[in-house]
């Protein structure tokens, strides 16, 4: 069965890649990071050239509302699961105060998990792989049989730019359920070669922290995701750093539980319990323009005030029964 999956996977990857090749934008393959990254590009072109698959960062989280710090709506709290669902795995909003303990996912390998009282703000997904990332999270709602760990591994494969055609058979099968052939072909084209040992050390020579730490984690994940026998726990230790998180460059003091005012007119806040589970609270005031609009969790990245911590994309899958 695994061999059959591999043959079909390789076949449609090859066909779709040929069809889509002419549509690839040159600008998506070129370019580079500014500042110190440009200076290092000759040393580590594969690691640093071009945009990361997901670029969402703290400057994109522009909707925090400090005036609502300490505020709790008077409405009785209800489960988001009581609202009408959408084909995207989202929810049709109605006036009221809602909560859901959701499955959330790490989008920044080589950084620290939630903790230390740091707050999180709303920002939308941005970057070359935003479409694929949102598709995985949205489509996972219709596939409850897929384990959260496997969804996280697919997202790490995208972030680390692993070759999807080289993934373990089970992950390939999962990818085929959640992504289109065109999306898979695009991800395969943007993949990087796996490096380890002295080759990895040489490639990272001269790269400063924290860029080195992130690039090293991504390189290790690329190798592990395509190596039979690598366990989820081993990959998690690479992607999610333990210990106290120092303040990252450009960090802001954001208290835990700060509300963000979504552009659609509702308030949202995120309170993570580790990277894989987040308490999402939504308040839709009476008369809000958000009434009747969709809350699509896949369009929500919870961005920490401490840039050394992980960005967490939300999902419409409950972590536990609501």
Residue ranges and their predicted role:
Residues 97-228:
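Mature extracellular/secreted ectodomains of secretory-pathway proteins
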Residues 37-157, 254, 275, 284-313:
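Short, surface-exposed polybasic-aromatic patches that bind anionic ligands, especially phosphate groups
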Residues 2-13:
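Bacterial N-terminal signal peptides that target proteins for export
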Residues 11-22:
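Bacterial N-terminal signal peptides
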Residues 28-29:
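Boundary of Sec targeting at the N-terminus
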Residues 73-74, 81, 91-93, 99-101, ...:
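Long, low-hydrophobicity ectodomains and other hydrophilic envelope-associated domains
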Residues 32-36:
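Extended, helix-rich scaffolding/adaptor regions
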């Amino acid at each position: 069965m695994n061999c059959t999956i591999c043959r079909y996977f390789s076949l449609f990857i090859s066909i779709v890649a040929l069809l889509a090749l002419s549509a690839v934008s040159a600008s998506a393959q070129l370019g580079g990071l500014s500042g110190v990254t440009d200076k290092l590009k000759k040393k580590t072109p594969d690691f640093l050239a071009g945009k990361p698959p997901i670029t969402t960062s703290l400057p994109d989280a522009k909707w925090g509302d400090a005036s609502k710090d300490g505020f709790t709506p008077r409405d009785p709290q209800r489960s988001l699961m009581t609202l009408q669902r959408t084909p995207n795995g989202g929810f049709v909003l109605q006036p009221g105060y809602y909560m859901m303990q959701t499955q959330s996912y790490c989008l920044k390998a080589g950084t620290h998990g939630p903790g230390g009282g740091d707050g999180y703000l709303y920002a939308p997904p941005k970057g070359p792989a935003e479409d694929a990332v949102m598709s995985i999270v949205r489509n996972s709602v219709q596939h409850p049989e897929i384990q959260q760990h496997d969804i996280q591994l697919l997202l790490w494969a995208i972030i680390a730019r692993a070759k999807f055609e080289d993934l373990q058979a089970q992950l390939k099968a999962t990818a085929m359920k959640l992504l289109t052939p065109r999306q898979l072909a695009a991800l395969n084209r943007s993949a990087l070669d796996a490096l380890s040992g002295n080759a990895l050390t040489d490639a990272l020579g001269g790269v400063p922290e924290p860029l080195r730490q992130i690039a090293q984690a991504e390189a290790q994940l690329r190798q592990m995701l395509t190596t039979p026998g690598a366990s989820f726990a081993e990959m998690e230790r690479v992607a999610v750093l333990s210990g106290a998180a120092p303040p990252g460059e450009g960090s802001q003091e954001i208290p835990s539980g700060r509300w963000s005012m979504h552009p659609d007119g509702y308030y949202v806040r995120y309170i993570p319990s580790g990277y894989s589970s987040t308490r999402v609270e939504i308040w839709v005031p009476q008369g809000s323009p958000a009434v009747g609009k969709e809350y699509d969790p896949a369009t929500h990245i919870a961005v920490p005030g401490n840039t050394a911590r992980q960005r967490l994309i939300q999902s419409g899958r409950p972590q536990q029964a609501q």
